[in-house]
């Protein structure tokens, strides 16, 4: 991530080149008293406003976690399927939590975060229960929405590790009905 201080009109802004959604983007930090003026100037230049729903859709299509929904202080990078985010230089060193991480890499985890595609357009939201084909509860959805890029509903959640393979058939309980889905 790169960032810097810039002057826009008569005020200072701090801009970082980043993107929380998987898209190229910028994050702008600005004094509150200039925020409305800044947005008005962007709109004059042709910018389009979006809301949290768009951000959520983009991040889910990209498979990105939302802290508090998909990951939290009790979730390890291995459970969240984020081992790739641990530097290769660091993975074998000692750091807070390294013993747990190393044990999970060696022995596996009980639950793991997966992407899920319901077979219908029904949207499975957070806390939707996930069942196997024998009707045993095996996990929960953490986030779900409609993905316009794939023209289908999408979700992510945690399932017991032995159900995490691609194309594993499972069922989501949405409003009292079981909906077929696949990893």
PLM regions: where:
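Conserved, structured C-terminal
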Residues: 1-183
């Amino acid at each position: 991530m790169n960032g810097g201080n810039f002057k826009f009109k008569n005020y200072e802004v701090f801009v970082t080149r980043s993107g929380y959604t998987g898209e190229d983007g910028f994050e702008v930090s600005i004094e509150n008293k200039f925020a409305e003026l800044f947005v008005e100037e962007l709109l004059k230049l042709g910018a389009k406003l979006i809301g949290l729903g768009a951000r959520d859709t983009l991040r889910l299509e990209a498979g990105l976690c939302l802290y508090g929904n998909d990951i939290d202080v009790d979730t390890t990078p291995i459970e969240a399927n984020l081992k790739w985010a641990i530097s290769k230089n660091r993975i074998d060193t000692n750091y807070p939590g390294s013993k747990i991480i190393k044990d999970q890499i060696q022995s596996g985890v009980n639950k793991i975060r997966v992407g899920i595609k319901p077979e219908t357009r029904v949207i499975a939201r957070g806390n939707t229960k996930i069942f196997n084909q024998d009707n045993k509860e095996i996990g929960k959805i953490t986030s779900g929405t409609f993905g316009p890029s794939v023209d289908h509903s999408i979700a992510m959640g945690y399932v017991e590790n032995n159900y995490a393979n691609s194309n594993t058939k499972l069922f989501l309980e949405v409003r009292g009905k079981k909906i077929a889905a696949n990893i």
